[in-house]
Amino acid sequence: MEEYDLYGVEDDFESQFASELEVLAELEDDVSSRPGPQRSQLRTKLSFEEAISAGDPIRSNANSKPTGDSNGEALACIDTSKSKKRDASCIDFEEDEFSDSIYEPPITPKHKRARIEAVKKLDFGRDEYAGNSTALSDDITPPPSPNHSPKKNERDSKFSSCEAFEVSDMAPLQVTPTESEQKRVLKRPPVLEDYINVTSTDGSRVYMALKEDNDGAQQKQGNLKWNSGQQLHLLGVPFSYLKEQVNDEHRRKVLEESQRLTEMLNSQINEEFGENDSEILENDDNAGEEDDEDEPSSHSLWVDRFTPRHYTELLSDDYTNRCLLKWLKLWDTVVFGKERVVRKPKAIVDPRANHFKNQKEQQSKFKTKAQITEEILEAELDHHNRPKNKVSLLCGPPGLGKTTLAHVIARHAGYNVVEMNASDDRSPEAFRTRIEAATQMKSVLGVDERPNCLIIDEIDGAPTVSINMLLSLVNRKDAKEAEGGTEATTGKKKKKEGGLLLRPIICICNDQYVPSLRQLRQQAFMLNFPQTMPSRLVQRLYEIAVKQGMKADTGALMALCEKTENDIRSCINTLQFLHGRGKKELNMRSVQTMRIGLKDQNKGLFSVWQEIFQLPKIQRKRIGQEVATNDLHLLLGSENDSLGMLAKPPLNAVAQRFHHILHLSTSTGEYEKLTMGLYDNFLNMKVKESNFSTVCLALDWLEFTDIVNSTIMHGQNFQLMRYLPFLPVAFHLLFAASNVPRIAYPSSHYEAQSKLNQMQNLLNAMVSEISPAIRTRVGPQSLVLDALCLLLDVLSPKLRPVNTQLFSTKEKQQLAELINTMLAYNLTYHQERTMEGQYVYKLDPNVEDVCRFPDLPVRKPLTYQTKQLIAREIELERMRRTEAFQQARNAGRDNTTAAAAVKTADPKGAKSAAKPAALNHEQRLENIMKKATFEEKPEKDFFGRQIVKKVAAPVTASANQEESVERRIGKAVGNSDVWFRFNEGVSNAVRRNIYIKDLL
């Protein structure tokens, strides 16, 4: 008989001896119903004796007796637990898989097994072998009845399962059927299934396949897992599982105690204040029932529960997600040691095909933000295999998912996320320590040994010193690249400061234009976070509402998104708040009337100016929507909501705009800058009236605001500040248009303020040097309004540009009066060089800018030679006056000294002739010589005794050396009328020959 004829022996044996097998099954039921020894459910491995006592005896057929060793003829059912799997049911050894001591029936000869047949091991079907199965009429008696009981049919179906063909030999299987499942024991490990191994006392090892628990009869154990690759525990369960059970029990007790204390406090508060609200009690009862069903979920925020865990769950912009992921993957070379993937060059396209597109690109000189971002991401790495920008800066409004995006992208790229908040600890030392610990250290013994990725949240709240410290860490160089110093000192310095930055840093901020981030913006990879798409956010909110049992239509969710400006965190918190209050349905009225969900954020000035000068988009009214109910609710108050809703009709579109701009301007707070922007831009808007009545009305509003602001500042009456936000509302109703306005930052106030400061400085410089006689009669205001314009006419006389020796008497007198006037008002001419390289004389201080408007025609100025002549004469006259003043002062001092000397010498009042005053140069030289000559004091020792020096006799001595050189020079100068002084050096001045007689 060929080998393929034996494929159906097992099935034929089962079908022919169905009645005998049924009797055996009934006997096995009696045996299995006997009580056995109790053991713990958590115990996963039994001894071999326990397996024998708990298992079923193996029978060869109905009349055969079990033979073999008493130590181990059969194996018991072993309960093990694995995640989402359980052990196979009670197993039964096959007779052909034990040793020779087990009885082997001579029913069918055991043929030699073929080499390897893929069909035998991999094809688990039975239909292919049904045709080849032949009944062995010589050895097997046909069953007495063709009818099969339900129990037998169930057993047939189980016997014909896939495990029936996993037996290696072709001998007939003698299986003890059970009520639940059929048992299998294998000699070799199965190929396509999980398994466990069992070794008997005689050294025989068998394998049991693991199957899923489809009926759910066995209780699943959550954290207890079976792994064939790990060693078995002596306790039967891992110690971590026992520890976790203790922690869960402790946590449950703490929660129960806190719940009990909360209920006790609430009851005391209700008794004290007498709050008996039936609705609140009903809501609390409903909430209590839900808490009993799902206790851990009630104590957690929905924002944390439904936060995205994977890249595909993100709600943010796809382009922003890809850019951040690309930048993070640039670190793979230095962090993970992976080579950078070279981007394939784009295919060459015929330039004639996109001629117009190329021409348009050539015309645009500036690159877009997308092009700049792509260039940064495609740039070459530095010689340390790091990207050009070592820090990434995510900036955008709060609640859009910036922190969530950074966490998800970092985990997706294979990093261990280390988060720190820059607003928690603002000290630079703590900031430095935490950054270095996150970027230069690694967990060695911890569970997560992945490289760290530092995420710094709210970095716009960090001081400038901390930002500078972060930049110094980012720009830190290697020891070989450090400039200056020896190699040893450089090594010590780098050892103290640390090494290079080899880990990515992601910074998150709300306002990128904070002064402290000015230096960081220049070196960081900037990513502006756009608003979330409303369609994505509405879909996610709908999924969350459905999971939590709330009913919400798309219109209400869209209105909630518009109210919160697509703030994900605010929307989810609003849903949780409403769900906690017991509301099971979210409609349009509840969204519009509730006071929650508003963002506590100030908009930028440009956004506010744009909303003031631009009409809002016309939106289609949704079903069930009532216009501006929230504004009406805020105006009427919270006491009589129903009466207020019935008393006044809904607001129209103009009233909506009124309240929206009023709320916007109130939340801004910067009234001065807002007013300046309105003043500089309202004349650029389109005016419908030809008589400019709107412009006049706007100027009246500006005047009113200026008066109110001045009253507030001068009188400290801050109650009037409530009227300042109405100016933007008036400008919106007067100048708002549908087109997008071109807003320019206000500069007129700054220019006027700088001009005023400049004029005040000119006047102060002029008045500070005016003679006291004039200053007492002329104030700054009267000088500007009355005197300066006429003074400029006085300073422009008609003089000939010739030498002063050629002036007539009248011209000399006119020049002298001009010089006296300019010196009296501290005015002169200074030479300056223009941008073209020419030299001009300008009035200093230039009071002409104070009293002359730039649009008025300039009077005929003086010529260059005339101004030069006037400037020279002013300098000479100033020197003469200074010298005369000094001489008068010195003469007065000498007279006072002489009078005091005479009074001391002649106390009786005798008059003596006054000594003539010495010349100026003589006084100077005498004073100089007096300072140069000094009396020598005798040298003394420590005890104050005079030291006598032995002077050596000079070799050659003359009588002329008795006096010192200084004294002889002083006498020579004092006794002569003319003296000379030699100046060593070179002079390029004009020289002429003179005689001594000209000097005398």
UniProtKB/Swiss-Prot annotation:
Region annotation (Disordered) ranges: 53-89, 130-159, 272-301, 888-916
Record key words, sorted: ATP-binding, Cell cycle, DNA replication, DNA-binding, Nucleotide-binding, Nucleus
GO molecular function per UniProt: ATP binding; ATP hydrolysis activity; DNA binding; DNA clamp loader activity
CDD domains associated with the record: AAA, HLD_clamp_RFC
Binding, ATP: G396, P397, P398, G399, L400, G401, K402, T403
Biased composition (Acidic residues): 272-295
Principal place of residence: nucleus
BP GO annotations: DNA replication
Polar residues composition bias: residue spans: 60-70, 888-898
Pfam families named among the record's database cross-references: AAA, RFC1
SUPFAM superfamilies (UniProt xref): P-loop containing nucleoside triphosphate hydrolases
GO CC term, one of those recorded: DNA replication factor C complex
Cell location: Nucleus
Superkingdom: Eukaryota
Coiled coil residues, start to end: none
Family: Belongs to the activator 1 small subunits family. CTF18 subfamily.
Subunit comment: Component of the CTF18-RFC complex, which consists of ctf18, ctf8, dcc1, rfc2, rfc3, rfc4 and rfc5. The CTF18-RFC complex associates with pcna.
Job description of the protein: Chromosome cohesion factor involved in sister chromatid cohesion and fidelity of chromosome transmission. Component of one of the cell nuclear antigen loader complexes, CTF18-replication factor C (CTF18-RFC), which consists of ctf18, ctf8, dcc1, rfc2, rfc3, rfc4 and rfc5. The CTF18-RFC complex binds to single-stranded and primed DNAs and has weak ATPase activity that is stimulated by the presence of primed DNA, replication protein A (RPA) and by proliferating cell nuclear antigen (pcna). The CTF18-RFC complex catalyzes the ATP-dependent loading of pcna onto primed and gapped DNA.
Name of the featured protein: Chromosome transmission fidelity protein 18 homolog
Organism for this UniProt entry: Xenopus laevis
